[in-house]
Amino acid sequence: MAFAGKRLKGLIAATFTPMTSNSDINLAAIEQYVDYLVQKQHIRNIFVNGTTGEGMSLSVHERKSLAEEWVKQARGKMNDVIVHVGCLSLSDSKDLAAHAASCGADAISTVCPSFLKPSSLDALVLYLKEVASAAPNLPFYYYHIPRLTGITYQIYELLGKVKKNIPSFRGVKFSDVNLMDFSLCVSEYKEFDCLYGVDEQLLGALAFGAHGAVGSTYNYLGKKNGDMMAAFEEGNLQKARKIQCSLQEFLIFVFDMGWGLAEFKDIMSQVSGIPLGPSRLPLYSSMKFDHHDNIKTKMLKLDLI
C-alpha cells in the first residue's frame, strides 16, 4: 500500500486469532485462513490483532509473531494488512507499531487505553501522535469503539485536531452506531478514509458515504456483504436492503442465543472448516455441538451460504 494516494476501501475482515486446544496461538492455520478469505469470501484486506483477534488478551510477543505470519501469508494474495497495535501501555503500543513497520504491514491502527482514559480530546490526540510517531511512514488509523472503551468523544471533532498534528493519519475505524457523527466525518474530512465497523448497519453507513468497512462477519459472510455493496453501488436498493435484512436476521438469531465473540469464532470454524480453536479466557464459548446444525439451517434459509 502506497503511503500517499491510495485509499482503503471495500470490505476488510477483522480476523480471528487461530489457537490450539490449550489456547496457544496457532500460526500454522493462517495460510489456510488467508486462502479461504481470498478464494471463498473474496476478501482482499485484513485487520489483525484487533477486538475480533483478541489482541488485548495476547502478549506483545504473540502479537508480533501473528503480525509477521499474517503479512507473510497475505503477500501476493491480498492488498492490505492493517495491524492493530493498541495496548494499555503506550510503550508497548509504540513497540508494536515499530514492529509492524519492520515486518511489512501496510497500515497500523490503535484504540486508546480505556482503563486510565484520556481526560480530554487533546489528551487523546497527544496519545495517538505518540503511537503514530513510532511508525511515521505507515498510514495510521484511529480505532473508535466506545461501547468497549468508554471513550465517547465526537470523531468529527477529533479529525479536525489530528489533521494538524499527525502527518501519517489516514482515517478511522468507526465502530459505533452514531451515524450522524460518522456522516460528519465523511462529509467534512474527505481526505480521510472512514471505515465503518458495525456490520449490521453497513448499508446505512454506505448511504452516508462509507469508504469501506471492517468487521468480524466478513470472515464468513464476506461474499454476501460484497454482493450487498455491489447492489448499492449499482443503485439496486431493493436487493441491497434484502441482503442487509437477511444478515441482520442471522445476527439477531445469534444475539438472541446470548452469544458473543467466542461463539462467532466457533461459527467461523464451522463455516470455513478451519480449526481456529477456542477463545482465550475470560472469553468462553457456550456453543454446543447440536447448535451447529441450527446455525447451518438458519444460514441456508437466509441464503447466506
From Swiss-Prot:
What are the recorded Gene Ontology BP terms? N-acetylneuraminate catabolic process
Location of the protein in the cell: Cytoplasm
Name the GO cellular-component terms.
cytoplasm
The protein's annotated pathway: Amino-sugar metabolism; N-acetylneuraminate degradation
Report the EC number(s), separated by commas if there are several. Answer: 4.1.3.3
Relate the assembly described in the record.
Answer: Homotetramer.
What is this protein called in UniProt? N-acetylneuraminate lyase A
Tell me what organism the protein belongs to.
Xenopus laevis
